[in-house]
Amino acid sequence: MVKIGVLALQGAVREHVRCLEAPGVEVSIVKKVEQLEDLDGLVFPGGESTTMRRLIDKYGFFEPLKAFAAQGKPVFGTCAGLILMATRIDGEDHGHLELMDMTVQRNAFGRQRESFETDLIVEGVGDDVRAVFIRAPLIQEVGQNVDVLSKFGDEIVVARQGHLLGCSFHPELTDDRRFHQYFVQMVKEAKTIAQS
């Protein structure tokens, strides 16, 4: 049994919970710092990254979230969650949690009216993964320890750095659970390593 939390400060929380629910997975909605202790993995949902950062600071999550990732526990960030994880944000002096060695650009694919859906090849997940882009960021560049798992044209939209997974789009807004299953597998593998 693995325990995965969805950070519930803002964003598509219930959609992520629905996608994560599976035999052998206990999913919880995380609203308090002390809930992090029992988790094996954590999801940062989409939303608005600046607002999410304000709430992270307000409720004392900043250092505990960094410590959670530093323990080698898997973290999965989608859309605004991806921005929270990046070490660098284009046009800004610094990142937020600065977990993944990458530079992201906010709203890279346009504002809400320019949102779109497409099918993508995502390494380790599938070659027909439905991707819903809503005011999505893109990953401009990644460090040498970061693997690019998917591109839309020439733009990086999914990357992984060890136990950290970042995605520009919203896999939780489709009925395809393969992306979340991929993350669940990351969590199971990390827990096995931690226990050995």
From Swiss-Prot:
Catalytic activity from the UniProt record: aldehydo-D-ribose 5-phosphate + D-glyceraldehyde 3-phosphate + L-glutamine = pyridoxal 5'-phosphate + L-glutamate + phosphate + 3 H2O + H(+); L-glutamine + H2O = L-glutamate + NH4(+)
Functional summary from the UniProt entry: Catalyzes the hydrolysis of glutamine to glutamate and ammonia as part of the biosynthesis of pyridoxal 5'-phosphate. The resulting ammonia molecule is channeled to the active site of PdxS.
A GO BP entry: pyridoxal phosphate biosynthetic process
Protein name as it appears in the record: Pyridoxal 5'-phosphate synthase subunit PdxT
CC terms in the record's Gene Ontology section: cytosol; glutaminase complex
GO molecular function, one term: glutaminase activity
SUPFAM superfamilies named among the record's database cross-references: Class I glutamine amidotransferase-like
Subunit and interaction comment: In the presence of PdxS, forms a dodecamer of heterodimers. Only shows activity in the heterodimer.
Segments forming a coiled coil: none
Domain of life from the UniProt record: Bacteria
Keyword Lyase recorded: yes
Pfam family, one: SNO
Record-annotated disulphide pairs: none
Pathway(s) the chain acts in: Cofactor biosynthesis; pyridoxal 5'-phosphate biosynthesis
Sequence positions that bind L-glutamine: G47, E48, S49, R106, I134, R135
Catalytic residues of the enzyme: C79, H170, E172
NCBIfam families reported for this sequence: PLP_synth_Pdx2 (TIGR03800)
EC number: 4.3.3.6, 3.5.1.2
Family the UniProt entry places it in: Belongs to the glutaminase PdxT/SNO family.
UniProt keyword annotations, A-Z: Glutamine amidotransferase, Hydrolase, Lyase, Pyridoxal phosphate
